[in-house]
């Protein structure tokens, strides 16, 4: 979309944050639990809300700084990786390649490879 809109003077920025230390899950998330997804949702939530994992997350202010930079610096840069954990994941994605990275993430979060592309 960035290529198409550029001809109209519209810039696109993609912010890719990692985890963000907030209480969002505790106060806002309604997973709409369905029995078919309960095991999957519980495993995923257990990983992302683990205190050790959460210690690697960025503060909201750190992410806001990246958003502000993307919006104001005037560079022709599409992707902004925000947070140390996001940068590590992005580096792993580049190293492994997209398909191997997706399989590794599926294994970590769900215990098996993705069922559909």
Feature map (PLM): residue ranges:
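Conserved alpha-helical elements of the SDR catalytic core
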Residues: 1, 5
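SDR active-site lid
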Residues: 6-77
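Short secondary-structure boundary/capping segments
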Residues: 29, 96-98
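Short-chain dehydrogenase/reductase
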Residues: 78-89
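A transmembrane-helix-recognition feature enriched in membrane-embedded lipid enzymes
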Residues: 87-96, 104
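Non-catalytic terminal and boundary segments that flank Rossmann-like NAD(P)-dependent oxidoreductase
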Residues: 101-117
